[in-house]
């Protein structure tokens, strides 16, 4: 018996990242991690910066970095509208490390008119990119 699947579309402002059938999707929603399977209840939520992992119809897994966006789930279709979506191959690891270091330094040296929220968002984005790269390098998904 074939595994049940659902249509997944992941698009960013620049292009379509993925269009196909999946048996599972994992993303970071506004309230925490979400695991979506076929026939999931309808849902609309914000996506936080982080890793998205999905299992394709052939059983292979793919991991992406999402900088944020919206997730719409219907029983037969899932749509991810990402601000930025990158495959691990497209992530500049050196730039992500530099962004992480800049954000950590900015937080450590915060002044009175420091934008803490912007610095923590930048830190979260760089850490999420590095996590995707690390997962691919180690060939793991958690």
From Swiss-Prot:
GO MF entries: ATP binding; proton-transporting ATP synthase activity, rotational mechanism
Record has Cell inner membrane as a keyword: yes
Domain of life: Bacteria
Protein location: Cell inner membrane
UniProt topology in membrane: Peripheral membrane protein
InterPro entries, sorted: ATP_F1_dsu/esu_C_sf, ATP_synth_F1_dsu/esu, ATP_synth_F1_dsu/esu_N, ATP_synth_F1_esu_C, ATPsynth_dsu/esu_N
Alphabetically ordered keywords of this record: ATP synthesis, Cell inner membrane, Cell membrane, CF(1), Hydrogen ion transport, Ion transport, Membrane, Transport
Keyword tRNA processing: no
GO cellular component, one term: proton-transporting ATP synthase complex
Annotated family: Belongs to the ATPase epsilon chain family.
Record's subunit section: F-type ATPases have 2 components, CF(1) - the catalytic core - and CF(0) - the membrane proton channel. CF(1) has five subunits: alpha(3), beta(3), gamma(1), delta(1), epsilon(1). CF(0) has three main subunits: a, b and c.
Function: Produces ATP from ADP in the presence of a proton gradient across the membrane.
Classification via PANTHER family: ATP SYNTHASE DELTA/EPSILON CHAIN (PTHR13822), ATP SYNTHASE EPSILON CHAIN, CHLOROPLASTIC (PTHR13822:SF10)
Protein name per its UniProtKB record: ATP synthase epsilon chain
Lineage of source species: Bacteria, Pseudomonadati, Pseudomonadota, Gammaproteobacteria, Alteromonadales
Gene: atpC
